[in-house]
UniProtKB/Swiss-Prot annotation:
SUPFAM superfamilies given in the database record: EGF/Laminin
Span of domain EGF-like: 65-105
Organism listed in the record: Bos taurus (Bovine)
Lineage per the UniProt record: Eukaryota, Metazoa, Chordata, Craniata, Vertebrata
InterPro entries: EGF-like_dom
Signal peptide interval: 1-31
Annotated function: Growth factor that binds to EGFR, ERBB4 and other EGF receptor family members. Potent mitogen for retinal pigment epithelial cells and vascular smooth muscle cells.
Name of the featured protein: Probetacellulin
Quaternary context: Monomer. Interacts with EGFR and ERBB4.
Source organism superkingdom: Eukaryota
Assigned keywords, A-Z: Cell membrane, Disulfide bond, EGF-like domain, Glycoprotein, Growth factor, Membrane, Mitogen, Secreted, Signal, Transmembrane, Transmembrane helix
One GO BP annotation of this record: epidermal growth factor receptor signaling pathway
Transmembrane segments: 119-139
Length: 178
């Protein structure tokens, strides 16, 4: 029976929970906030090659997707700041830290998302430390068992070898031929 070299038969099974946890945490880290961001480029583009328009044009510059909320929506957002979506003619909210929802009505338990990258690194390090501790514990427990098994096997071999050799003194009788 051929035995695999030590360390070559490592099962990928313990890595699956770590991989799953990493993917879940990555999904949380990649998730965006709860509002649409305004465009960063306020300039107008014209022409086929998306070049900037000359400064002499009289076209008004776009201010963005949002404007101030009308007075009728003054208290529309419960825990946040109101802004008006120009294209849809509807109010929208920019929630205060720790709140979420269309009108900032829900408490966001995971509002410490600013440090998501740091949380991801800490979680991955913790998983790796737990994995290393698990591997060291398994090796520490298995090594004495292997030694004991080898010792028993060696003792059994010695016993079987000892039984096969018949004692010389018991079976041989001396005869005198002279």
């Amino acid at each position: 029976m051929a035995r695999a070299a030590p360390g070559s038969g490592a099962s990928p099974l313990p890595l699956l929970p770590a991989l799953a946890l990493g993917l879940v945490i990555l999904h949380c880290v990649v998730a965006d906030g709860n509002s649409t961001r305004s465009p960063e480029d306020d300039g107008l583009l014209c022409g086929d090659h998306a070049e900037n328009c000359p400064a002499t044009t009289t076209q008004p510059k776009r201010r963005g997707h949002f404007s101030r909320c009308p007075k009728q929506y003054k208290h529309y957002c419960i825990k946040g700041r109101c802004r008006f979506v120009v294209a849809e003619q509807t109010p929208s909210c920019v929630c205060d830290e720790g709140y979420a929802g269309a009108r900032c009505e829900r408490v966001d338990l995971f509002y410490l998302r600013g440090d998501r990258g740091q949380i991801l690194v800490i979680c991955l390090i913790a998983v790796m430390v737990i994995f290393i501790i698990l591997v060291v514990s398994i090796c520490t427990c298995c090594h004495p068992l292997r030694k004991r098994r080898k010792r028993r096997k060696k003792e059994e071999e010695m016993e079987t070898l000892g039984k096969d050799i018949t004692p010389i003194n018991d079976d041989i009788q001396e005869t005198s031929i002279a």
